[in-house]
């Protein structure tokens, strides 16, 4: 089970998540070295892959910087759970396939260092030590798909690959016509689109 790191204060800003003096790189592994440095210098030594941050309201406020998401993800954090998030930070989290879960009363459910049982499909988080459980705002399927893909760009690329494969299959099927009816024996009875029609449709799909 993941360990919970509690940062109970409200309005933790992006400069505390990753100080501006370290914004000289976009490499997550480098940014990770300084995650939460101005709030808790020992955080990066304690955090393990899959751990969770529990925070106060308006997490990620302040200046807009995707580095604030990259630093936590690079450090191994799997999710941040807070009553609510700064709008831009929340959007950046979704775009980068990082979980930002909204849950009222979350800072009262855990003490720092406790373990958590997180059920994304069920929309619950539980403290196994106390047996107490809270529900969080359900994660939209779209956001889960983006998270599974690893971010918005990866999600879009995967969609393009699937669409390209679908079009290739459709083009191949059209080229063979119906089973038992060789294409070209009787042009008037051809079922598949003419090559120029298929090509034009494919180009149009790629431009959409």
From Swiss-Prot:
Keywords: Amino-acid biosynthesis, Branched-chain amino acid biosynthesis, Leucine biosynthesis, Lyase
Region (Disordered): 163-208
InterPro entries: Aconitase/3IPM_dehydase_swvl (IPR015928), AconitaseA/IPMdHydase_ssu_swvl (IPR000573), IPMI_Swivel (IPR033940), LeuD (IPR050075), LeuD_type2/HacB/DmdB (IPR011827)
E.C. no: 4.2.1.33
Biological process annotations from GO: L-leucine biosynthetic process
Known catalytic reactions: (2R,3S)-3-isopropylmalate = (2S)-2-isopropylmalate
Gene Ontology terms, MF aspect: 3-isopropylmalate dehydratase activity
Domain of life: Bacteria
Family of the protein in this entry: Belongs to the LeuD family. LeuD type 2 subfamily.
Free-text function comment from the UniProt entry: Catalyzes the isomerization between 2-isopropylmalate and 3-isopropylmalate, via the formation of 2-isopropylmaleate.
Subunit structure: Heterodimer of LeuC and LeuD.
Protein name: 3-isopropylmalate dehydratase small subunit 2
């Amino acid at each position: 089970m993941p360990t919970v790191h509690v940062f109970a204060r409200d309005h933790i800003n992006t400069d505390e998540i990753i100080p501006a003096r370290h914004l000289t790189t976009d490499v997550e592994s480098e940014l990770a070295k300084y995650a939460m440095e101005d709030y808790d210098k020992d955080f990066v030594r304690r955090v393990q892959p899959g751990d969770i941050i529990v925070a106060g309201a308006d997490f990620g406020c302040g200046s807009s910087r995707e580095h604030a998401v990259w630093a936590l993800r690079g450090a191994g954090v799997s999710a941040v759970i807070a009553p609510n998030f700064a709008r831009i930070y929340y959007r950046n989290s979704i775009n980068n396939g990082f979980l930002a879960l909204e849950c009222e009363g979350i800072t009262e459910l855990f003490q720092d260092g406790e373990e958590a049982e997180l059920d994304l499909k069920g929309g619950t988080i539980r403290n196994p030590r106390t047996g107490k459980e809270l529900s969080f705002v359900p994660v939209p399927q779209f956001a889960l798909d983006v998270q599974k893909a690893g971010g918005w760009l990866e999600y879009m690329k995967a969609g393009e690959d699937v669409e390209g494969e679908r079009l290739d299959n459709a083009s191949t099927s059209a080229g063979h016509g119906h089973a038992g009816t060789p294409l070209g024996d009787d042009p008037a009875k051809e079922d598949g689109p003419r090559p120029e029609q298929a090509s034009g449709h494919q180009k149009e799909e790629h431009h959409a």
